[in-house]
Structure formats: C-alpha cells, structure tokens
Amino acid sequence: MTKLAQWLWALALLGSTWAALTMGALGLELPSSCREVLWPLPAYLLVSAGCYALGTVGYRVATFHDCEDAARELQSQIQEARADLTRRGLRF
C-alpha cells in the first residue's frame, strides 16, 4: 500500500467518524459541549497540520548545512563538461 493510500484511508476513517458523531448517525446523544467542540474540529486539525508543516520547513531551512566539498566537485564537473563540449564544437 502506498503512502498516499494510507493517508487517504486514515482521512476517510477520521472523516466518516467525525460525520457519524456530528450527524448523530450512531444514535449517541452527545452533550452540547462535546458537539460544540466536534463541529470545528476539522478546521482546527487543518490549521494545526499547517502550523506543523510550516514549523518543520522553517526548522529544516534554518539547520540546512552547506556542502562546500560537493559544490566544488560539481563546479569542476561543469568545467570538464564545458571543455568537452567546446572541444566537440559547441560554442557558449
């Protein structure tokens, strides 16, 4: 099972549980305070997931390491490729 399928299954399970609880399909009579928390729950979860994603990206950008050796190696490979292409008749 792919990761997308796992996420879709989890989303379908959570969504159907939320819908069943809020619409009263299970026959459970939830107190009013629970229903007031349950209705906006998907929006809260979406905002929480967005904050987590933004924090994760920010942390990864802040702790990104420069790879100076790899950059030098890549630059030398580019120079070799340019020299080879120039030798074969390509003009830059």
Curated annotation (Swiss-Prot):
Subcellular location, principal: endoplasmic reticulum
Cellular location(s): Endoplasmic reticulum membrane
Pathway: Protein modification; protein glycosylation
Residue ranges crossing the lipid bilayer per the database entry: 8-28, 37-57
GO biological process assignments: dolichol metabolic process; GPI anchor biosynthetic process; protein glycosylation; regulation of protein stability
Pfam families: DPM3
Family matches, as InterPro entries: DPM3
Membrane topology: Multi-pass membrane protein
Keyword Membrane: yes
Alphabetical keyword list: Endoplasmic reticulum, Membrane, Transmembrane, Transmembrane helix
Gene Ontology MF annotations: enzyme activator activity
One cellular component term from this protein's GO annotations in UniProt: dolichol-phosphate-mannose synthase complex
Keyword Endoplasmic reticulum: yes
Quaternary structure and interacting proteins, as annotated: Component of the dolichol-phosphate mannose (DPM) synthase complex composed of DPM1, DPM2 and DPM3; within the complex, associates with DPM1 via its C-terminal domain and with DPM2 via its N-terminal portion. This interaction stabilizes DPM1 protein.
Family of this protein: Belongs to the DPM3 family.
Function (record text): Stabilizer subunit of the dolichol-phosphate mannose (DPM) synthase complex; tethers catalytic subunit DPM1 to the endoplasmic reticulum.
Protein name, entry field: Dolichol-phosphate mannosyltransferase subunit 3
Species, as recorded: Bos taurus (Bovine)
